[in-house]
């Protein structure tokens, strides 16, 4: 199992979702994707859509300012 | 026809399927098409795009102006219509300057460009189809399109494919 980091704090719709989805598709089952994202649409919907697609959201935590960290297990 | 005229043609039964009829070859409407397509695919939707008429320009292998097509009139049309890189904006095109300005602004503001959205659609395995009738008029072959175009369809097959989801006409 490995952890891959993805920073989408500077991305805008739809690339926030697109980059998360593509990163997840490259992982092996059991690997973890650590996503840095900002409040608003990315924070509301990246964890939600990941859960809906069958991935396990392990943690959503505040980092600093508007930046949050989401851990997603494939 | 403006983006405000995007029409929802059907009520969804299966909310996880989005089908888009890409009729316009305009830059701004193609951005709308590929933004919706990639966003939907990324959050788990099955996405189908049916390219017809001017929309076929978006999926040509040759992205600039070239004499694509069989026959002199289709070749001439093919040249003036061009491909993805030649797409005009639907308003204030200013002889093709505006798409260049939009591309500059999109890069500067870190928003995905049209070309990046198309690449994302390929990576997310969005299903792309070409309209058989429009291809026939314009003298285009499947080999004139990017490899990711899955098939050449007529209306009946597209209706089968899109059944049960949302359908948009752009």
Predicted regions and their residues:
Chain B
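N-terminal glycine-/serine-/threonine-rich phosphate-binding loop
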Residues: 2-29, 35-38
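Short, glycine-rich nucleotide/cofactor-binding loops
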Residues: 20-30, 59-60, 105-109
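Histidine-anchored nucleotide/phosphate-binding helix
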Residues: 31-44, 49
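Short internal beta-strands
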Residues: 47-53, 129-131
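N-terminal beta-loop-helix "entrance" segment that forms/cooperates
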Residues: 56-68
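A glycine-rich helix N-cap at a beta->alpha junction
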Residues: 67-103, 110
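A charged, amphipathic interaction segment
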Residues: 94-156, 160
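Gly/Ser-rich helix-loop-strand patches that form or flank binding pockets
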Residues: 160-170
């Amino acid at each position: 199992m490995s952890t891959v980091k993805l920073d989408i704090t500077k991305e805008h719709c739809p690339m926030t979702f697109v980059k998360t989805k593509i990163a997840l598709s490259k992982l092996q089952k059991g690997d973890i994707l650590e996503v840095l994202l900002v409040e608003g649409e990315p924070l509301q919907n990246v964890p939600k859509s990941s859960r809906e697609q069958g991935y396990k959201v392990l943690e959503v935590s505040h980092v600093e300012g508007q930046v949050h960290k989401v851990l997603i297990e494939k | 026809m403006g983006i405000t005229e995007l029409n929802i043609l059907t009520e969804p039964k299966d909310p996880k399927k989005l089908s888009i009829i890409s009729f316009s070859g305009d830059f701004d409407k193609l951005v709308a098409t590929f933004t919706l397509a990639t966003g939907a695919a990324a959050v788990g939707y099955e996405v189908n795009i049916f390219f017809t008429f001017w929309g076929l320009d978006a999926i040509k292998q040759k992205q600039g102006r070239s004499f694509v097509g069989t026959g002199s009139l289709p070749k001439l049309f093919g040249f003036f219509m061009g491909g993805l890189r030649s797409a005009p904006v639907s308003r204030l095109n200013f002889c093709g300057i505006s798409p260049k300005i939009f591309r500059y602004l999109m890069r500067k503001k870190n928003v995905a460009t049209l070309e990046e959205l198309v690449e994302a659609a390929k990576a997310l395995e969005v299903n792309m189809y070409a309209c058989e009738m429009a291809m026939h008029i314009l003298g285009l072959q499947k080999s004139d399109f990017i490899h990711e175009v899955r098939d050449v369809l007529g209306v009946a097959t597209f209706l089968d494919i899109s059944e049960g989801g949302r359908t948009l006409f752009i």
